[in-house]
Every structure is written in C-alpha cells, then in structure tokens.
C-alpha cells in the first residue's frame, strides 16, 4: 500500500488563539515510485491565493486530517486478485416516466447522448429529475465517433468519422424543446477532421434551441478546438449560459490520460478565452476525474491554476474504467476526501463545486444549483437595471 500522507504547510491564524500557527494536514499522497516535482515556481497570482487561503480561511483548520491511508482511498486490487468496488460506488438502475420518454425520443430521432455512450452511472437520476425535479440530459452532437483516443473514454474513435448531419442542429433543438427539460448540456466528440473543428455546427445548435426555448438554460461542454480562438469565440457568443471544457485530470497526468493533441495549458487557455468572449454573466466550468494516479498535492495545485484562470464552477468525480481496454483505476477515493476537496474549492473562491464519487461533469444535482445561481444573478441584474421609483410628492 502506498504511503498516503505528508504535510502541506498551510499557515492559518485561528480567531481564538493569539499569534498561534496551525499546520494543516493535506491530502498529499506521495507514492514510493514518484520523483520530486520539478514544476516551476507558480505565478504571483497563485502565491497570493495560497497566502490568502492560509491566513483568511477559518474552514481550512479542519481540512483533511486523515490519519490512515484508508481514510483517503481504497485499493482496487490486482489482475489476479481484484477487489470489489466500495459500497459508495454501487450504481442505481435507471427508470421513471421521464427517463422512458427521453430514451424513446432519442431512438426515434437517431440522436446520441454522452450519458449512454460513456455509460454514466447517473443517467436514470438525471433523466428522471431525481430529488430536485430538474430533469437534465447531455446530448452529443457532431456524430458518435471521435477523432481522438483518450485513455479513459468509451466513445468510439476514427481518423475519418462520417460527416456531420447538416440537419442535426434543427433536429436536436426540436427534440430538446419537446422534452420539458429545465437545463440541457450539449456536448460533442472532437472533430479535428473539420476546418472549424465543428464549432459552427455547435453554435448553430445552441442558437436554434434558444429560439425555440429562450428560457431554457444551455450548457455547452466543448472540446478544445485545438486552442483556436476563433472557434472558442464562435461558441462563446452563441447564446449559451454555461461554457464548459474539461481539463480531465491534474496537470502532471495529462499525457497519460488524454490524447496527445490535448494538454493542460491549451485547455486552460480555452477557458480563459471563453470568459473574455462570452456575454457578461456567462459561467465557465471544468471537471477532473480522481483515481487516475494523481496525488492530493497535484489536485490542489491544479485547482489553484483553474481558479486563477477565472473558472466559476469545478466538479470532481471518481474515474471508472469503461472496459479492460481502457486505463485502469488507480484507487477509489473516499466520499470524505471528495468532501474535503469541495470545501477547499469553495474557500478558493469557486462559485460552486460538485465533488463526490458518482459526480460527473454533467450532473443533475450540480445543474440544479447552477440553474438557481444563474436565476439569482439575472434577478439581481434586472433589479439593479430597473429605474428607481420616483419619490412621492
């Protein structure tokens, strides 16, 4: 078993102890096979953020006091002696009237969802609306075949996928408009084979849906478009409410997890550009998987850089191996550790953090809170822009 804990010296002045310094334990996991990090010194913005967290955030005093390795994660076993999934990773069986309705409509229109393609464990909960009543679905456009081959992804791949259906934006918009959804996520495969990486097709889909359902909240979960600013601008200005692009894993594991054409710097730049191009009030969002071999220290550094890029929402979920052909799971992170990352993310200044073993980038519970947040922002904006009543005579 790997050694799980070492200390991250986060200094914190507690209100009830004059001039006392508390060394906080971190989720740092140092593996015997790892070598000392060779990362350059973080930029001043990150240094300032670390200082602010250490000095000003009282909730960090309780951050991750994990005393044994099992508090952070559990092993997955070996090929010869595999271990069963922990109890918190048990999946529920999809069902419900809305679930059945959405699935039937998808088949009729020959549309694809990443929920099905990626075998998402939350599909039934999201499609049915679950406890919140906010039914959501994640529609995948530009076909079901990706030009890239990330080591975690179950979507089929090809260097030359079929051309996109030119009528797809209209079909998707009409289908989604008829489902009675409150919040929809539109995503796509990577289309490196297309001159504009599929960005025009993506933007057209969002625009057509907004015409039919102007009050529906739309999240666009986009590929990196090879970092092309023109492609990012096109989608950012299409009328979406949330611009999402996933960095997938910590900076140090990018080449081990993602396709060689993707990288951390490029993804971070896409998120920065989206913030610049999109209308005021548009949220930016990203997600990473845990259990890929990352250390807690790497997760924290990645969070710092994502927040410094102005990202509003971040989600964390457990990586699950889709098949034996894919990258193996390194470890199962405990719900308690996920909760610590959520607390730290909120202390860093993210507006919302969804973190849990079964959380995925497009997750019903998270979308419910994001919807509430956007509604509140718009109500406040409307109130501040309304003319003040004239004083009584």
Curated annotation (Swiss-Prot):
One of its GO terms (cellular component) is mitochondrion. It is an enzyme of class 2 (transferase). It holds the Pfam family Radical_SAM. It is found in: Mitochondrion. PROSITE patterns: RADICAL_SAM. Its cofactor is [4Fe-4S] cluster. The keyword S-adenosyl-L-methionine applies. InterPro entries: Aldolase_TIM (IPR013785), Elp3/MiaA/NifB-like_rSAM (IPR006638), LIAS_N (IPR031691), Lipoyl_synth (IPR003698), Lipoyl_synth_mt (IPR027527), rSAM (IPR007197). [4Fe-4S] cluster 2 binds at residues 146, 150, 153. Pathway: Protein modification; protein lipoylation via endogenous pathway; protein N(6)-(lipoyl)lysine from octanoyl-[acyl-carrier-protein]: step 2/2. Binds 2 [4Fe-4S] clusters per subunit. One cluster is coordinated with 3 cysteines and an exchangeable S-adenosyl-L-methionine. Residues 131-351 form the Radical SAM core domain. Its EC number is 2.8.1.8. GO terms for molecular function: 4 iron, 4 sulfur cluster binding; lipoate synthase activity; metal ion binding. The keyword Transferase applies. It catalyses: [[Fe-S] cluster scaffold protein carrying a second [4Fe-4S](2+) cluster] + N(6)-octanoyl-L-lysyl-[protein] + 2 oxidized [2Fe-2S]-[ferredoxin] + 2 S-adenosyl-L-methionine + 4 H(+) = [[Fe-S] cluster scaffold protein] + N(6)-[(R)-dihydrolipoyl]-L-lysyl-[protein] + 4 Fe(3+) + 2 hydrogen sulfide + 2 5'-deoxyadenosine + 2 L-methionine + 2 reduced [2Fe-2S]-[ferredoxin]. Its main location: mitochondrion. [4Fe-4S] cluster 1 binds at residues 115, 120, 126, 362. Keywords: 4Fe-4S, Iron, Iron-sulfur, Metal-binding, Mitochondrion, S-adenosyl-L-methionine, Transferase. Belongs to the radical SAM superfamily. Lipoyl synthase family. This protein may be expected to contain an N-terminal transit peptide but none has been predicted. This is Lipoyl synthase, mitochondrial. The lineage of its organism: Eukaryota, Viridiplantae, Streptophyta, Embryophyta, Tracheophyta. The gene is LIP1.
